[in-house]
Amino acid sequence: MNNLFATQRVFNADISSWDVSNVTTMSNMFIYCDVFNQPLNDWDVSNVTDMSFMFTYAYAFNQPLDNWDVSNVVYMQWMFVDASAFNQDISMWDVSNSIAMGRMFQGARTFNQDISSWNVSKVFDLGYMFLNASSFNQDINEWDVSNVEFMAGTFWGATAFNQPLNNWDVSKVKNFSYAFKSATAFNQPLNSWDVSNVTNMSSMFFYASSFNQDISSWDVSTVTQMVRMFYNANTFNQDISSWNVSSVEDMNLMLDNSDFSISNYDVALINWSQQAVQPEVKLGALGINYCDGADARQNLIDTHGWVITDAGLDCSTASVEDQNQLNITIYPNPSSDRVYIEGNYSQLKVVVYDILGKQVINESITNSIDISQLEKGVYILQLSDGAKLTTERILKN
């Protein structure tokens, strides 16, 4: 029955009594059947293996399918693409033999049914599955996605979706590009995800305007593409300086118009400049200023040929973080041997970094730091009394 009623835009006959028990493929069966909306729930589809594109662009279709035995269906990709009226309970479907669900509910704008019990353990493709499925907001945290390799665009435009996903085993996924693009409600922890096999994170959180979760522990060492990763993710402000970005070839527009603070941008520049990064990488941070990361930024440009677009140097205004900084005075600066610190404290923890982000001093002090053994140059001091933290720059001459 492949393509049987394809493009029959006015077809709307009652075919509910058909004996389809020997049919093995229903691919494209009702594609572009604009007005079709007839009962099909009595069909015996137990021998069907391919339902891909079955109701694609069947804009009016919204009939129960809960009686269907889909246990032999292997291909479900594009099944309900732009079936914009469809919102039926298919929670009991046995999809355990399906391997492909890419774009299954793309544009199914009213679909919002509980499919939490689905066994998707054989599926390798969930790409664009809920693209523009703007009503979908169901808990699918217990899905076994351990064999999925492709999750590009999975929740792109799923504007209502904000459910936990931290239990997902994504260790085989290679492509997360556009995964949460324009998923404007999504703000759930993803810190447990093993992304060590991912190579593409381009546009992953593009316009994900609510997302602001700690993903500092992610192993991104195999990622080569981070273009537009947080573009216009205008609440995202997390420390990702610990990321190993040595494989990344393109960060163009990566942080543009995000909510990245000066301090988070600084520490990212400092730590990344210490890595064996790729040459001539474009890093976009439009709207974001730097201060203490100035030397590290210049090192990335001069040594590695990076092209960095940001809002420039700004050490003049206090950031939100600065409101909790220590009230101290450091002198002399520059200094050749010892730097003294005055302020209302009893003891300070001090960590000193060189311009490449390498830690050169880590100790507790009472009133001074011995820098006599350091090479000449600019150093960054992080000082903490246990409650407040401040960052200062000194020059060793």
Question: Where are the regions that the model predicts?
Answer:
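C-terminal outer-membrane/trafficking sorting elements
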Residues: 323-397
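Negatively charged
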Residues: 2-317
